[in-house]
């Protein structure tokens, strides 16, 4: 059931291995990258309690030893204090340029560990072993690393490609239903932005995938990663097509900032709501039929996911404040917001030609339902 997706970036190319049981094979797969048979592992306390011993055994089976630092779980870890702690620990471990750092966790750990590897000694190689669905299909692939700033999400970082990604789909079985569905928000995004047939497949197979069907999970992760790999190979540093991967994220990042990057709204939940809002905005601008946002919301609802601002607990700021929060988005060019909109399911495109009033109206209507 193992699948391999190749990310073609010349000298920085690497493989993404996908399937159950990869943690047990970690040593054999990572050893060829190592000048000395040891790795420094950055993880979080939740993942460490569930999977760290399995990783230690998997590495040892390939003759590789490890030291590990477990950081607190959650988005609040992705900031300067824990980043400094991780970087100091890596220096304490005497990690050299020829060594490999292993990011073992979800998107927060992958982003932080990758950024630490990018700047440590001006660049150390790293391997991603993503343990959440969101990280397996999105953040572990493509080389975006970084941390959050007081001004907004992911504003401090670097492009630093991993040397290998091991996506063990068996660990997805240990995720809470909420965390799994948050990751599913990113899976749906791929169908919505460029593969209508994949969205059709998800409408049929989504329930089996959520229920634990391993073949369906491997297929969903593989198709998602393949689409991302193809886009990254064309546009590694987000000068063009790669911005399509941010479908739903302009709304999402504003909502995450408005909820204090807290458990009120997980990133993947924000992406799902953001995709629904992006399709609603597209329909109101006459770019796609009203049937499309209805279909998007219907599938998300059928999967038991958040689809509207009403699904976010607690108070939200006004539409004006939310639009102002969008102005801190990384996709802003010359002060203009760039939106990813759609001419239909699977037909996303990037545009700066979106009237502020149209965005305000969509948000005001969504807030009025709260």
From Swiss-Prot:
<keyword id="KW-0520">NAD</keyword>
<dbReference type="GO" id="GO:0003856">
    <property type="term" value="F:3-dehydroquinate synthase activity"/>
</dbReference>
<dbReference type="GO" id="GO:0005737">
    <property type="term" value="C:cytoplasm"/>
</dbReference>
<dbReference type="InterPro" id="IPR030960">
    <property type="entry name" value="DHQS/DOIS_N"/>
</dbReference>
<dbReference type="InterPro" id="IPR056179">
    <property type="entry name" value="DHQS_C"/>
</dbReference>
<keyword id="KW-0057">Aromatic amino acid biosynthesis</keyword>
<feature type="binding site">
    <location>
        <position position="267"/>
    </location>
    <ligand>
        <name>Zn(2+)</name>
    </ligand>
</feature>
<dbReference type="InterPro" id="IPR050071">
    <property type="entry name" value="Dehydroquinate_synthase"/>
</dbReference>
<dbReference type="InterPro" id="IPR016037">
    <property type="entry name" value="DHQ_synth_AroB"/>
</dbReference>
<keyword id="KW-0456">Lyase</keyword>
<feature type="binding site">
    <location>
        <position position="144"/>
    </location>
    <ligand>
        <name>NAD(+)</name>
    </ligand>
</feature>
<dbReference type="GO" id="GO:0009073">
    <property type="term" value="P:aromatic amino acid family biosynthetic process"/>
</dbReference>
<dbReference type="Pfam" id="PF01761">
    <property type="entry name" value="DHQ_synthase"/>
</dbReference>
<feature type="binding site">
    <location>
        <begin position="131"/>
        <end position="132"/>
    </location>
    <ligand>
        <name>NAD(+)</name>
    </ligand>
</feature>
<dbReference type="GO" id="GO:0008652">
    <property type="term" value="P:amino acid biosynthetic process"/>
</dbReference>
<feature type="binding site">
    <location>
        <position position="153"/>
    </location>
    <ligand>
        <name>NAD(+)</name>
    </ligand>
</feature>
<comment type="function">
    <text>Catalyzes the conversion of 3-deoxy-D-arabino-heptulosonate 7-phosphate (DAHP) to dehydroquinate (DHQ).</text>
</comment>
<dbReference type="GO" id="GO:0009423">
    <property type="term" value="P:chorismate biosynthetic process"/>
</dbReference>
<keyword id="KW-0547">Nucleotide-binding</keyword>
<dbReference type="GO" id="GO:0000166">
    <property type="term" value="F:nucleotide binding"/>
</dbReference>
<feature type="binding site">
    <location>
        <begin position="107"/>
        <end position="111"/>
    </location>
    <ligand>
        <name>NAD(+)</name>
    </ligand>
</feature>
<dbReference type="GO" id="GO:0046872">
    <property type="term" value="F:metal ion binding"/>
</dbReference>
<keyword id="KW-0862">Zinc</keyword>
<comment type="similarity">
    <text>Belongs to the sugar phosphate cyclases superfamily. Dehydroquinate synthase family.</text>
</comment>
<dbReference type="Pfam" id="PF24621">
    <property type="entry name" value="DHQS_C"/>
</dbReference>
<keyword id="KW-0963">Cytoplasm</keyword>
<keyword id="KW-0028">Amino-acid biosynthesis</keyword>
<feature type="binding site">
    <location>
        <position position="186"/>
    </location>
    <ligand>
        <name>Zn(2+)</name>
    </ligand>
</feature>
<comment type="pathway">
    <text>Metabolic intermediate biosynthesis; chorismate biosynthesis; chorismate from D-erythrose 4-phosphate and phosphoenolpyruvate: step 2/7.</text>
</comment>
<feature type="binding site">
    <location>
        <position position="249"/>
    </location>
    <ligand>
        <name>Zn(2+)</name>
    </ligand>
</feature>
<keyword id="KW-0170">Cobalt</keyword>
<keyword id="KW-0479">Metal-binding</keyword>
<dbReference type="InterPro" id="IPR030963">
    <property type="entry name" value="DHQ_synth_fam"/>
</dbReference>
<protein>
    <recommendedName>
        <fullName>3-dehydroquinate synthase</fullName>
        <ecNumber>4.2.3.4</ecNumber>
    </recommendedName>
</protein>
